[in-house]
Amino acid sequence: MDPVIELNDVVAVLGQFPALAGANLQVSRGEIVLLQGPNGAGKTSILRVCAGLLPIERGSGRVLGIDLVTQRDEVRSRVGLLGHSNGLYLDLTVEQNIRFWASMVNATEDEIVRAMSLMRIDGRLSSVKTARLSAGQRRRCALASLIVRRAEIWLLDEPHAGLDAQGRDELDSVLRHAVSAGATIVLASHEMERASALATRVVTVDGGGVQ
């Protein structure tokens, strides 16, 4: 089976600083791959390269068969990245954020309602501007937005952060359901026990490379 993510000797920089130094990674469809490693090892940089947000300086990469060097815009339209900022518009309400992302893929009303239900977003919470939300509520809103986008690949940076115990359990259930529906997931997490139990494979990132 051809990999849906393939990085070959990838070098990337952030400003003047090296972010990745010859990283190699292959991910097959339907996997949940956990990136583990110390802070600054390159986990977030790998996610950003795979999302088409961090350019490759040297080496090569493909996501869903799309070249990461020459077709980054197309990659961005096919994958979903959940980072520390959550990708939310703070001046919009929760529901407006979700409906904005839903409009990008012509998601149905049923899909919108289901995504909000999965992430426990009720009528009261849906009308609140995201600037007023707690960290956990923002994360739930961002995950609902990711669900309605129908992303084929989910790239998750600390997805359990800010969630209570119930929210973490619900997130794990959502991720397993996404994989059963055809998605592939790569995540970085400090919740090692929980994330390891969720993952189908664990890879170690250190010094800007994958071991």
Positions of PLM-derived features:
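Helix-to-loop junction immediately C-terminal to a conserved catalytic motif
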Residues: 51
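The feature captures the beta-strand-to-loop junction immediately N-terminal to the Walker
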Residues: 36-38
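ABC ATPase C-loop
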Residues: 146-147
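Conserved ABC ATPase signature
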Residues: 129-133
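Catalytic Walker B motif of ABC-type/P-loop ATPase nucleotide-binding domains
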Residues: 154-158
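Conserved ABC transporter NBD signature motif
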Residues: 59-67, 75
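Conserved ABC ATPase "signature" region
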Residues: 99, 109-125
